[in-house]
Each structure stands twice: as structure tokens, then as C-alpha cells.
Amino acid sequence: MTSLIRSNSWGSFVQTITSSSNRLYIGWFGLLVFPLLSLATVAYITAFFLAPAVDIDGIREPVAGSLIYGNNIISGAVIPSSNAIGVHFYPLWESLGLDEWLYNGGTYQFVVFHFFLGVCGWMGREWEFSYRLGMRPWIFVAFSAPIAAAAAVFIIYPIGQGSFSDGMPLGIQGTFNFMLVFQAEHKILMHPFHILGVAGVFGGSLFSAMHGSLVSSSLLAETAGSESLNNGYVFGQEDETYSISAAHAYFGRLIFQYASFNNSRSLHFFLAAWPVIGIWITSLGVATMAFNLNGFNFNQSILDESGHYINSWADILNRADLGIEVMHERNAHNFPLDLA
């Protein structure tokens, strides 16, 4: 009898977890997603408001990132783990106590690891839900792009640089600081993978705007002139709500014939694939720069036949990068040897 009750309870639990008719699909991955993301969110908000200063450079000069220490929404951040910790896994039980753990930036690892595992679980949940509904798996494939970007910035880059102190701070100003320092140290703007990523993101935005405007401009009129065109659409209707042939004809004549799609499926696959592939490539670029396979640099000035310098924008960019690098961790640098 007891085993029967347990069997029924387990069956009811499985039915609740895997049912695709729930208002919010949970799924087996959801059992990981919701606790992990909840812990990451609570820890992040708490640290953003209340965390003490962190010895990010490992030189006993802690940096404060919380609001209680005078920061605002722009300058506030969860400061990365101390350089003294390096790439060691640093849970609370590896420290002598909570004060030491906070001083060495253990909160950063806590938030990053829980967040990253949570969003990976979210990707798995997307696949699981698609599988339950008999859908194709492209939603979870598309979501792998931001997952790859998060892995590159929060996991691979700190490991490649030898310390989680090189990870991106979890704040607005910290993000921009990370971007500037990344350019100074790795010349990311001159890396071909970053260039392809920019083409992917901005190209995806352009294509999305073009597609949306074309569809909105070629809606099939199902209503009277005094009514909104939106009232002519019924959710779940079998008929198309716009004329793809009209949109194709317009765009083909606006630019040239083969710049336009005449197949709705290939069009939407292209709209999904272009930015996803671009972000994949950028993530790969950040992962390679993590191990100092950098973009093109201008460390050598241009010389004429007599050996005199020829001033160029390359020198300006190089000096700007050096200046940014000096300002970054200014007390940890040994000027000018660090610029060699």
C-alpha cells in the first residue's frame, strides 16, 4: 500500500513537472533553473546594496562597489574576485569566514557560477519544452549564442588570463571599464572575429527592422477603412496575414531581385541565423583573446627611408590603448616596464 502511494505521488509529481499544459512550463531542467537563478538574483541584489569593498588587485587596496559605500546605479557593481584567489574555486567553506570571503570577492564567483548554470539550464528547458510540443529545436540553438557570450566573458576569459579578477564587473560602469581595458590589452576592435560579430548584431538589427517594416507595409486588408488593420487578424488563423509576394516584389525592385526572399521559411531562418552566427564568432574571438591571441596591433610606427617617424592614426590609437592600460590598475602597474 505504501509503495502504491509513493508510486502515485511520484507519478503525480512527474506529471506536474513535465506537463506542457501548465501556465508556466517547469520541466526537469526547471528544477535546476529556478533555484539557481533565484540564488544568483538574491545574491546579486544583496551585494549590489550591501557588499563590503573587495581587494580585486590582491594588493590590499580594496575597491567598493555597493550602494552603501557611496556608489550609485551607474557606478555600482559586484566587484570580481581578488587576484590573490586567481582561478581557484572559492566557495564560502574555502575561506576562514564570511568576512574574508567577502573581502576576497567570493560573492562574484557565487553570482557568476549560479547565473551561468541557471541560463544553461534555461537553454535545456527550451529544448525540453520544444520536444514536448513536437517543435523543432531552433529556439534553444538560438539561445546558445548569448550562452556562448556569457561563457566567454565570465568563464573562459578569466581562466585564460589566470584570475577571476579579470572578469567583467557586474555593473554598468564596470562593464564599460571592462570593454576599454579589453581594447587596451587585446586590440579587440581590430580582431576579425569582433568585426564579424558587429556585422552580425547590427546586420541582424537592420534585417529585423527591414522585415518588420515590409510585413507591416504589406498587411492584407481585412477590415473597413475606419478600423485598424490589426483588427483583421485572428490569433491562430490559417491564412497569412501579409502578402509576401508584394513584399518580395517591392524589395526586389528597391535593391535588386536576388536581395529579396520569396520563401518565408528561408527568410525567417536567415533572420535567426545571421545574428546567432555573428555572436558565436565574437564569443570565439573573446575566447581566443583570453589566451592573448589578440587583434592586429600598431606597436611599430611607420618609418620613412631616413628612419623618421611618420605620424598616423595608428600611433594615436596605440597611445590611447597604452594610456587606458596605465590608468587601469594604476597602483599595480610598474610604469613603464608594463608597457613593453
UniProtKB/Swiss-Prot annotation:
Residues given in the record as a quinone binding sites: H211, S260, F261
Sites where the protein binds Fe cation: H211, H268
GO biological process, one term: response to herbicide
Positions of the record's site feature: Tyrosine radical intermediate: Y157
InterPro entries recorded: D1/D2, Photo_II_D1/D2_sf, Photo_RC_L/M, PSII_D1
Reaction(s) catalysed by this chain's protein: 2 a plastoquinone + 4 hnu + 2 H2O = 2 a plastoquinol + O2
Subcellular location(s) of the protein: Plastid, Chloroplast thylakoid membrane
Membrane spanning residue stretches: 25-42, 114-129, 138-152, 193-214, 270-284
Residues annotated to bind chlorophyll a PD1: H194
Residues where chlorophyll a ChlzD1 binds: H114
Keyword terms: Calcium, Chlorophyll, Chloroplast, Chromophore, Electron transport, Herbicide resistance, Iron, Magnesium, Manganese, Membrane, Metal-binding, Oxidoreductase, Photosynthesis, Photosystem II, Plastid, Thylakoid, Transmembrane, Transmembrane helix, Transport
Bilayer topology term: Multi-pass membrane protein
Protein modification: Tyr-157 forms a radical intermediate that is referred to as redox-active TyrZ, YZ or Y-Z.
EC identifiers of the protein: 1.10.3.9
Pfam family, one: Photo_RC
Record-listed [CaMn4O5] cluster binding positions: D166, E185, H328, E329, D338, A340
MF-aspect GO terms: chlorophyll binding; electron transporter, transferring electrons within the cyclic electron transport pathway of photosynthesis activity; iron ion binding; oxidoreductase activity, acting on diphenols and related substances as donors, oxygen as acceptor
Main localization, broad class: plastid
SS bond partners: none
Record keyword Phosphoprotein present: no
Site (Stabilizes free radical intermediate): H186
Family stated for the protein in its record: Belongs to the reaction center PufL/M/PsbA/D family.
Subunit comment: PSII is composed of 1 copy each of membrane proteins PsbA, PsbB, PsbC, PsbD, PsbE, PsbF, PsbH, PsbI, PsbJ, PsbK, PsbL, PsbM, PsbT, PsbX, PsbY, PsbZ, Psb30/Ycf12, at least 3 peripheral proteins of the oxygen-evolving complex and a large number of cofactors. It forms dimeric complexes.
Role: Photosystem II (PSII) is a light-driven water:plastoquinone oxidoreductase that uses light energy to abstract electrons from H(2)O, generating O(2) and a proton gradient subsequently used for ATP formation. It consists of a core antenna complex that captures photons, and an electron transfer chain that converts photonic excitation into a charge separation. The D1/D2 (PsbA/PsbD) reaction center heterodimer binds P680, the primary electron donor of PSII as well as several subsequent electron acceptors.
Name recorded for this polypeptide: Photosystem II protein D1
Organism: Amphidinium carterae
Gene label: psbA
